[in-house]
Every structure is written in structure tokens, then in C-alpha cells.
Amino acid sequence: MGSTRIPLVKALHSPVSDYVNYDIIVRHYNYTGKLKISADKDNGIKLISVVFILICCFIILENIFVLLTIWKTKKFHRPMYYFIGNLALSDLLAGVAYTANLLLSGATTYKLTPAQWFLREGSMFVALSASVFSLLAIAIERYITMLKMKLHNGSNRFRSFLLISACWVISLILGGLPIMGWNCISTLPSCSTVLPLYHKHYILFCTTVFTLLLLSIVILYCRIYSLVRTRSRRLTFRKNISKASRSSEKSLALLKTVIIVLGVFIACWAPLFILLLLDVGCKVKTCDILFRTEYFLVLAVLNSGTNPIIYTLSNKEMRRAFVRIMSCCKCPSRDSASKFTRPIIAGMEFSRSKSDNSSHPQKDDGDNPETIMSSGNVNSSS
């Protein structure tokens, strides 16, 4: 009984001295076979790394402009835009973290202490986790809004900050678990090949969490589409042909947008999920694909580059503001300032009548068919 407990305790509670022992990095990389791979390829910074760094620089600049657009435009200081700003911040940090990861890779890896290595890899986990959790938070917010059929108010502001705070707290905990003890410093046979100081059980845990997040996002967006289709059928049943036709067009546009959102997300993240599952299942030095991690990871990072396009630039009002920021124009045009749009997902916005501004409760769905998600601009029905 005691003999089986000791390795478990060591795996969860590594001595403090292990975190500053330079030999541990070399030992673990040698055990997994990555030391030989690195030695064979180590001729300075690789061309592919330069390409990846340039991609990260684009992602960083792209998301900086999104944050500047939201900050400089007062009409965007609203709960839904907080989610978009939070997504841009996490994507920006993902670009920064991956750039730092690339610069500290290769021969530099063996000059790091385990504590520094955990910080290098953990920062990537935190940034990418925050990005995925932000996508989930946006989906939750849109679903709740669709259920209530109400636009944002004070209570929604509190809910927004609560969801955003939860994104970062959970991401920090998830990324910090290895440095807090869930690692394989003392148990080499349990080590991951992709991340040689990470325990395979931790890799499996993270993959499971991200897969559940993906499924949750898919379910929420499918539910949103279902709600829109239900309201469209109600209008058809009431023989309100013109409004039903408009609603059907919006439903089709919504379906296309949902396919884009989920398709891009799955295309970027699924390969990395599969690689990590292989890492958990494969024995050490048996799966050559595990030594090509950078190509799978850069796909996940690319999702941070597509998010601003899907969630921000597809909104016409934000696109105008974005262009103004890029052109260093300090005075927004009156024409664009007179309109106001509320992004939902990937260019989907609310359309509403003046009655939405009142304090009266929302009427039957059929009386306000414009209060649904669309793919166009917001046009007041008055």
C-alpha cells in the first residue's frame, strides 16, 4: 500500500529544489526523445519559426486595433463589447505567449529551470484557455439574451463582468496546475512527449475540458438557431408573410454564420485535440507525429487571428470604427455616429423598434419579429 502511494505523492508534490534544477529539463527531453530531435535540428532559429512569429505579430496588431477601437468609441462601452474586448485581449496574449514560446525554444529550452519552463508553457495554456472560455462566454450571453429577448441593461453589465472574471480565474487555475504540483518531475514514465514535464493525466484532463467547451459552444449556437427558426415558424403560422419572409432570410444568414463560427473553431482546435489524445495514448518514442507539435499548435493560435474577423470586423459599425482607428482619424463621421449596432455573433445583430427603449415588458414574439438575430446592419423599424 505504501509503495503505491509514494509515486503519487511525488507526482503531486515535487520538491522545491526540483523547480530550479537545470538537469531535469535535459533528463525529461532525453527520455521522451525530444533532446535528440532538438540537437539534430538546432541550427539557430528555423525559417518556420520566423513565419510563425510573423503570424503572431499580425495577430497581436490585429487585436490591439480591436481593443483600441472599443476603447476609443464610446458607443462600444457596453456589455456585449466587453466580451469582444475580452476575447481580443486573450487572443493578443495568446500571440505574445506563443512568440515568447518560440523565442525560448530550441537550445534555449535547456537553459531554463523547470519553474521557467512551466511559466513558458503555462502562459500559453492560460491565454488559449481564456480565448476559448471567452468564446463560450459570448455564446452564453447571446443565448441568455435570445431567451429573454431583451437588450443589455445594468444587470447584464454585472453578468458580463462575472462571466469575464470567471474566464480568467478558471484559465489561470487550469494553466497553473502543473507548476502547483500536477507534473511528472518525479515520475518519468507518466510524462507527455509533447510537453515533457507535464503529466499525461493533466494533458488528458485539459483535452477533456476543451472538448466539453467545444460541445457546449456547438449546443448553444444550435439552440440560438433553433430559437430563431421557431419564431420564424410562428410568424408563418400567423400568415404574416412579409415579416416571416424577412425572418426566414435572417435565419438562413444566421445558419451560415453559425457554420462559419463553429467550422473555423473546430478546424483550428480539433487537430491539436487529436494530437494531445495521441500523446496520452502513445508509448514514449513510438509516435513520430508527436515531434511535429508546432504545426498543430500554430493552428490553435491562428484561431486568435480569425476571431477578430468573425466577431468584430463582420459588424459594419465596428468595421467603420476600426478603419478610422487605423487611418488615425480622430473625428468620427456624423453619419456613422448616428447609427448604433449591437453585435451578436459574427456579424449578427439585433434589430429593434423604438418601443424596446421603454421600460415596458417585451410583448409577444410575433409583435416584435425584428428582435431577432440577423446578419445585416441594425435598422430601426421606425
Curated annotation (Swiss-Prot):
Disulfide bonds join 184-191, 282-287. The modification Phosphoserine is found at residues 351, 353. It is found in: Cell membrane; Endosome; Membrane raft. Keywords: Acetylation, Angiogenesis, Cell membrane, Chemotaxis, Disulfide bond, Endosome, G-protein coupled receptor, Glycoprotein, Lipoprotein, Membrane, Palmitate, Phosphoprotein, Receptor, Transducer, Transmembrane, Transmembrane helix. GO terms for molecular function: G protein-coupled receptor binding; sphingosine-1-phosphate receptor activity. The chain crosses the membrane at residues 47-68, 83-104, 117-138, 161-182, 197-224, 258-278, 290-310. This is Sphingosine 1-phosphate receptor 1. It comes from Bos taurus. The gene is S1PR1.
